[in-house]
């Protein structure tokens, strides 16, 4: 597995509170805007979808691709970020 980004490290270091969806690793401005347009404006809303999908990597990656057009790397970065956050805080 590749090393995690600073964005990933910053996100998983603390409770997410009201962080923007763009605070998630793998989600930049373009994907963030697409997610916001579909009602996923906060990181915790994406976390909710992640949990509804039972933290299943394949289902979450597919959902992210279908919802905002995330590529394979972006999908993996976002999944890993949420998985590690859940391991620390849930």
Curated annotation (Swiss-Prot):
GO terms for molecular function: DNA binding. It holds the Pfam family SAM_BAF. The modification Phosphoserine is found at residues 2-3, 5. The keyword Transmembrane helix does not apply. GO terms for cellular component: chromatin; condensed chromosome; cytoplasm; nuclear envelope; nucleus. InterPro entries: BAF, BAF_prot, BAF_sf. GO terms for biological process: chromatin organization; chromosome organization; mitotic nuclear membrane reassembly; negative regulation of protein ADP-ribosylation; negative regulation of type I interferon production; response to oxidative stress. It is found in: Nucleus; Chromosome; Nucleus envelope; Cytoplasm. Belongs to the BAF family. Has a helix-hairpin-helix (HhH) structural motif conserved among proteins that bind non-specifically to DNA. Homodimer. Non-specific DNA-binding protein that plays key roles in mitotic nuclear reassembly, chromatin organization, DNA damage response, gene expression and intrinsic immunity against foreign DNA. Contains two non-specific double-stranded DNA (dsDNA)-binding sites which promote DNA cross-bridging. Plays a key role in nuclear membrane reformation at the end of mitosis by driving formation of a single nucleus in a spindle-independent manner. This is Barrier-to-autointegration factor. It comes from Danio rerio. The gene is banf1.
